[in-house]
Amino acid sequence: MKILYVEDNDDNIYMLKNRLTRAGYTVVVATDGAQGVALAASEQPDLILMDLSLPVLDGWEAARRIKATPTTSRIPIIALSAHAMTGDQEKALAAGCDDFDTKPVELQRLLDKIRTLAPPESAA
């Protein structure tokens, strides 16, 4: 299963990409929201992990654009945020994200969300 991880923090990328790879996932990385939108279209991942605080295009707008594009609209998106502020989850879901999780990521909880939104049998 292929996951697109949209994140601009190198430490977060290194940590989560390695953990997901060890769990058996192929991980493609975008470092800003615009690149995330482009890679969602070209890579057609099974699921997207989207940081919300991104350069160029924030995660909320990137999620809106991905969900508004017919070729990417069905890709599940899990929003990730270190700022678990009141309203962030609601704002992410309103932007089209399918789920929300906080950073630092608790791996087992995130893996459970990934399996729920993109079960292995749905992988291309």
Feature locations, PLM:
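Charged docking surfaces used in two-component/phosphorelay signaling
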Residues: 14-22
